[in-house]
C-alpha cells in the first residue's frame, strides 16, 4: 500500500493551497513553495476554511494536523518528500520548466502530480529525466472537500506510478479515477466546457440572466448529478426498459438544433461586463470567503445525506466518506502510551473550531455531547472495544447521560477531557467526564454517563468478555481510591 508521509506543493493558489490543506488534515507535513508575497496569508485562509469544513464533515478522530513549511526554492521544497503536487499557472512552458526542476531535485521514487486542467501529461513530461513517475492529478475545487482526482498518465508514465497514485489518494479520502487515454481537458473539464459554452450563449442572447441559469441547475438536474451522475440518471429516465429505451426515445434529439456549444461565443468586453454585473447582483454583497463557507456547508450536507444512502451503506461520495471515516477510526486505535489510573484519565485534547460555535462564538450544545462521546469512545479503545470489536457484533451503548454546563467554551479555545470511573460490572460502565480549559484546568462542563455492553445483532445486553474486563479492572481499582467527583449523582433541578 502506497502512503504519503510527506508532501510538497509547488504553487499555493486556490488549487495548490487546497491541496496543502487536504494533505495537512490527513496528518501529512507539507513543504510549500510559492513566490507570491502573500502566499502564507492566502494558504492560511484556505486552511481555516478547510478546518471549519472538516469540523462539520466528520466526528472520526483526525490525525494531528500536518505542519506547513514555506520554502525558498523548489529544490528545498521537494527534498525527501513522497508526493509533489505542481499547481502553477496554466502555461505549458512555465509548467514544463517547473516540472523539470522538480524532476532534477526530487527523490527518484517520488510521485510527481500536476494539477493542470487540460494540458497533456505527455507534453509536460517531454523533457524529464524520470518521466515514468509523472502524471496528471487533476482535482476539483475545493480540493479539501471534493474527493475526485482524475489520474492521467502520459506516454512515458509507468502503470506502476498510476497504481501507486490511486492507492495514495485513497488514503487521504480521495477517489482516484484513472482516465484510460490522455486527451486535452480529460473528462470532467470537457463536460464543463460544453455546458459553459452553452451557458455563455444563453446570457449573450438574453435568454436568461446568471441567477436564473444557476437556479435551473441547482433546483433540478444539479441535484440528480450530485448523486447519480449523467448515465445512471438517464437510465432511470428510460423507465423499466432502461437505457436502451431512453436512447431510442431521445437519440433523435441529437439531430435537432437545440444547442450552440459547438460555436464559440465572442467573449468581448460587453459580454464580460454583462456577466460581471449580473454575477455581482446575484452575490448580494457576499464576499468570496462568505460564498466559500456557504458552499462548503452545503457540500458537507450533501455528503452526509449520501453517506446515509443505499440503506445506510452509503452512495457515491457518501460511501467514500464512510470508507474514509472507517479508516480514521481504525487508525485512531488505542492511545500509544500507558494510562495512569491513579487519577482521572486524560483522553482527548482538542480545540474549538469554527464549525463548533454559534452566532455568539460559543461552543454549541451538541458539540459538548460530541466531545463527551469522543471521550467515552477513547475509553472503549483503551479496554479493547475498537472498530474491529464493534464490527464483530458487540459494543457498549450509552443508556443515560446527565450534562452540567459550568462555563463557556469559545472559538479557538484549547480543551482537554478527563474521565473517572465510578463503578463497573460485567455489563455496565458508570463514569464521570470533565471538559477542562487547557490553559487554566478549570472545568467547563461535566457529564455523568452509563453504558451497557450489548450484542448488537440480538439487540440485548450481554456480559462483556474476559479480555475486556481484564483491561477495565486496573482502571476500576485505581479510581475506586479517588474521591467522588463534585456533581456526581445530581439530577436536574436539584438544590445545592
Swiss-Prot record:
Taxonomic superkingdom: Bacteria
Compartment(s) where it occurs, according to its Swiss-Prot or TrEMBL record: Cytoplasm
Region of interest (L-carnitine dehydrogenase), ranges: 1-335
Pathway(s) where this gene product acts: Amine and polyamine metabolism; carnitine metabolism
Effect of deleting the gene: Disruption of the gene in strain Rm2011 abolishes growth on gamma-butyrobetaine (GBB).
Pfam families: 3HCDH, 3HCDH_N, 4HBT_2
Keywords annotated in UniProt: Cytoplasm, Hydrolase, Multifunctional enzyme, NAD, Oxidoreductase
Region entry Betainyl-CoA thioesterase, spans: 336-496
EC identifiers of the protein: 1.1.1.108, 3.1.2.33
Binding-site positions, NAD(+): 11-16
Substrates-to-products reaction catalysed: carnitine + NAD(+) = 3-dehydrocarnitine + NADH + H(+); N,N,N-trimethylglycyl-CoA + H2O = glycine betaine + CoA + H(+)
GO cellular component, one term: cytoplasm
Disulfide cysteine pairs (residue numbers): none
GO terms under biological process: carnitine metabolic process; catabolic process; fatty acid metabolic process
Keyword Hydrolase attributed: yes
GO molecular function: carnitine 3-dehydrogenase activity; hydrolase activity; NAD+ binding
Assembly information from the UniProt record: Homodimer.
Function: Multifunctional enzyme that catalyzes the NAD(+)-dependent oxidation of L-carnitine to 3-dehydrocarnitine and the cleavage of betainyl-CoA (N,N,N-trimethylglycyl-CoA) into glycine betaine and coenzyme A. Can also hydrolyze L-carnitinyl-CoA, but with much lower efficiency. Is involved in a L-carnitine degradation pathway that allows R.meliloti to grow on L-carnitine as the sole source of carbon and nitrogen.
Protein name as it appears in the record: L-carnitine dehydrogenase/betainyl-CoA thioesterase
Organism, as annotated: Rhizobium meliloti (strain 1021)
Lineage, highest ranks first: Bacteria, Pseudomonadati, Pseudomonadota, Alphaproteobacteria, Hyphomicrobiales
Amino acid at each position: 500500500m502506497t502512503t504519503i508521509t510527506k508532501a510538497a506543493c509547488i504553487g499555493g493558489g486556490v488549487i495548490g493551497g487546497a491541496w496543502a490543506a487536504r494533505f495537512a488534515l490527513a496528518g501529512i507535513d507539507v513543504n510549500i513553495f510559492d513566490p507570491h508575497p502573500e502566499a502564507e496569508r492566502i494558504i492560511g485562509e484556505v486552511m481555516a476554511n478547510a478546518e471549519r469544513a472538516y469540523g462539520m464533515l466528520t466526528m472520526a478522530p483526525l490525525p494531528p494536523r500536518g505542519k506547513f513549511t514555506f520554502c525558498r526554492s523548489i529544490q528545498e521544497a521537494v527534498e525527501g518528500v513522497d508526493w509533489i503536487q505542481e499547481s502553477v499557472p496554466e502555461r505549458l512552458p512555465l509548467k514544463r520548466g517547473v516540472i523539470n526542476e522538480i524532476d532534477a531535485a526530487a527523490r527518484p521514487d517520488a510521485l510527481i502530480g500536476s494539477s493542470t486542467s487540460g494540458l497533456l501529461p505527455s507534453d509536460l513530461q517531454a523533457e524529464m529525466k524520470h518521466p515514468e513517475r509523472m502524471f496528471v492529478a487533476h482535482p476539483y475545487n475545493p480540493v479539501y472537500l471534493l474527493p475526485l482526482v482524475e489520474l492521467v498518465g502520459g506516454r512515458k508514465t509507468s502503470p506502476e506510478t498510476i497504481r501507486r497514485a490511486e492507492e495514495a489518494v485513497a488514503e487521504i479520502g480521495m477517489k482516484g479515477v484513472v482516465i484510460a487515454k490522455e486527451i486535452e481537458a480529460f473528462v470532467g473539464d470537457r463536460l464543463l466546457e460544453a455546458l459553459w459554452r452553452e451557458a455563455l450563449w444563453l446570457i449573450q442572447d438574453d435568454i436568461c440572466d446568471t441567477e436564473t441559469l444557476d437556479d435551473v441547475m441547482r433546483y433540478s438536474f444539479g441535484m440528480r448529478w450530485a448523486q447519480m451522475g449523467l448515465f445512471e440518471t438517464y437510465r432511470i429516465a428510460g423507465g423499466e426498459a432502461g437505457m436502451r429505451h431512453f436512447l431510442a426515445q431521445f437519440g433523435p434529439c441529437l439531430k435537432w438544433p437545440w444547442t450552440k456549444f459547438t460555436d464559440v461565443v465572442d467573449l468581448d468586453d460587453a459580454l464580460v461586463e454583462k456577466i460581471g454585473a449580473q454575477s455581482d447582483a446575484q452575490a448580494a454583497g457576499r464576499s468570496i470567503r462568505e460564498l466559500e463557507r456557504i458552499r462548503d456547508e452545503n457540500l458537507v450536507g450533501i455528503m452526509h445525506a449520501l453517506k446515509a444512502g443505499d440503506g445506510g451503506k452509503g452512495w457515491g461520495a457518501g460511501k467514500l466518506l464512510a470508507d474514509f471515516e472507517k479508516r480514521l477510526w481504525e487508525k485512531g486505535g488505542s492511545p500509544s502510551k500507558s494510562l495512569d489510573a491513579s487519577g482521572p484519565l486524560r483522553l482527548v485534547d482538542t480545540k474549538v473550531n469554527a464549525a463548533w460555535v454559534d452566532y455568539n462564538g460559543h461552543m454549541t450544545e451538541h458539540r459538548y455531547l460530541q466531545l463527551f462521546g469522543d471521550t467515552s469512545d477513547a475509553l472503549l479503545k483503551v479496554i479493547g472495544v475498537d472498530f474491529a470489536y464493534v464490527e464483530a457484533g458487540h459494543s457498549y451503548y450509552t443508556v443515560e447521560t446527565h450534562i452540567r454546563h459550568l462555563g463557556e467554551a469559545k472559538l479557538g479555545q484549547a480543551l482537554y477531557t478527563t474521565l473517572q470511573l465510578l463503578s463497573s460490572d460485567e455489563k455496565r460502565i458508570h463514569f464521570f467526564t470533565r471538559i477542562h480549559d487547557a490553559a487554566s484546568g478549570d472545568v467547563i462542563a461535566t457529564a455523568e454517563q452509563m453504558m451497557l455492553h450489548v450484542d448488537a445483532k440480538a439487540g440485548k445486553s450481554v456480559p462483556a468478555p474476559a479480555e475486556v474486563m481484564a483491561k477495565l479492572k486496573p482502571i476500576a481499582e485505581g479510581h475506586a481510591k479517588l474521591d467522588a467527583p463534585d456533581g456526581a449523582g445530581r439530577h436536574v433541578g436539584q438544590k445545592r
